[in-house]
């Protein structure tokens, strides 16, 4: 019975929020809201914009390092070990791994911006 009540409550709340989300934007319509101009891009211009491959590589490198730091660095503290030496060794290993990979990217000129 409690499961049915929880499911019904969640379904009702989700449906209500979806209805409100579709209904609210239609209350105040003005010309800027209905125009296709968005974020400084001309919708009638060329769809082929120049793309910097160097920027793409730096952005991918940043994302990889960011994910490594966000996901791997808390791992030693989340392992629930009582041994402080093991926890510090794991943390030091991950930090050294990040430093070595950053040094490798730097020596391979993956972070250089000059063309």
Curated annotation (Swiss-Prot):
This enzyme's EC code(s): 7.1.1.2
A GO term from the CC aspect: mitochondrial inner membrane
Keywords: Electron transport, Formylation, Membrane, Mitochondrion, Mitochondrion inner membrane, NAD, Respiratory chain, Translocase, Transmembrane, Transmembrane helix, Transport, Ubiquinone
GO molecular function annotations of the record: NADH dehydrogenase (ubiquinone) activity
Record PTM N-formylmethionine, positions in chain: 1
Membrane topology of the entry: Multi-pass membrane protein
Main location per the UniProt record: mitochondrion
Membrane-traversing stretches: 3-23, 55-75, 84-104
GO terms, biological process: mitochondrial electron transport, NADH to ubiquinone
InterPro entries: NADH_UbQ/plastoQ_OxRdtase_su3, NDAH_ubi_oxred_su3_sf
Localization per record: Mitochondrion inner membrane
Disulfide-bond pairs as recorded: none
Pfam families membership: Oxidored_q4
Its job: Core subunit of the mitochondrial membrane respiratory chain NADH dehydrogenase (Complex I) which catalyzes electron transfer from NADH through the respiratory chain, using ubiquinone as an electron acceptor. Essential for the catalytic activity of complex I.
PANTHER family: NADH-UBIQUINONE OXIDOREDUCTASE CHAIN 3 (PTHR11058:SF9)
Quaternary state and interactors: Core subunit of respiratory chain NADH dehydrogenase (Complex I) which is composed of 45 different subunits. Interacts with TMEM186. Interacts with TMEM242.
Family: Belongs to the complex I subunit 3 family.
Protein name per UniProt: NADH-ubiquinone oxidoreductase chain 3
Taxonomic lineage of the native organism: Eukaryota, Metazoa, Chordata, Craniata, Vertebrata
Gene that this polypeptide is encoded by: MT-ND3
């Amino acid at each position: 019975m409690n499961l049915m009540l929880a499911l019904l409550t969640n379904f009702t709340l989700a449906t209500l929020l979806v209805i409100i989300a579709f209904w609210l934007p239609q209350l105040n319509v003005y010309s800027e809201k209905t125009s296709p101009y968005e974020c400084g891009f001309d919708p009638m211009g060329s769809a082929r914009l120049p793309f910097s491959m160097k920027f793409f590589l730096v952005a991918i490198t940043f994302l990889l390092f960011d994910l490594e730091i966000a996901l791997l660095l808390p791992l030693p503290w989340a392992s629930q070990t009582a041994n402080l030496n093991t926890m510090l060794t794991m943390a030091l290993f991950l930090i050294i791994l990040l430093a070595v990979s950053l040094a490798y990217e730097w020596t391979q000129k993956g972070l250089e911006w000059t063309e």
